[in-house]
Amino acid sequence: MHNIRRYILLMTTFALTLATMAQERVVQNKPFIDERPWHYGFHIGLHDQSLKLINNGFVDPATGAQWMAENDRQNFGFSVGILGDWRITRQVALRVSPGLHFGSKHIGFRNQADGARRSQDLKTTYVAVPVDLKIAAPRFNNYRPYLVGGFSAMYDMTNAKGEMLRTKALQTFVQIGMGCDFYLPFFKLNPELKFYFGLGDVLLHQRAELTNPEQQIFTQSLSKANSGMVVLTFYFE
């Protein structure tokens, strides 16, 4: 939650800066680009993955071990993809922006019984297909702020077996965000900050590949896990 407040403060400062700049009109770059019904482009960005883990206090009856797990650090990664944008009205557009998210989630484990520690770097390569509704303000000079929200399906291609924890390969998210269109002389640049909230439990509870009880205890110690992500994206149209 602290990180989300920091990201929102950053975007608020950015919006106030734009308002300060909007004191007089200037010559518009690419004045007719928004009249086209279809827009295409690509996007690159950075993201911070998170995994909210719910511990259940399970105690191993054989050893007395009680492991607690948490996503104990920020996990920055890289994103890249393409986009297609369909203008519905002058202020509303439907956008599809399939892409790849390369990242990881660092999980720390602590045994409450003896203080022992373990860790896991849960690597992910998501193939993502987000569908968003983009609602934009009227254009002023060479920028145009907007809000965006929608739904995304992601498939993790690096879901390796044998790890202490595994998450489901297919995950779904709802997302909301904000951004701004900047009209440059030769293209349109859209920096955007978006928050992804995972739907449902993504922890893989049935681990038939684990035959050692010492490996199974990490999954048994968790009730559920929820994915999340904060993505800073730069769209080029």
Q: Can you annotate each of these PLM segments?
A:
Residues 23-76, 235-237:
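Short glycine/proline- and aromatic-enriched beta-strand/turn motifs that initiate or cap beta-hairpins
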Residues 36-38, 74-78, 123-129, 143, ...:
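Residues that define the transmembrane beta-barrel architecture of outer-membrane proteins
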Residues 50, 91-94, 141, 186-189:
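Repeated loop/turn-to-beta-strand initiation elements of outer-membrane beta-barrel proteins
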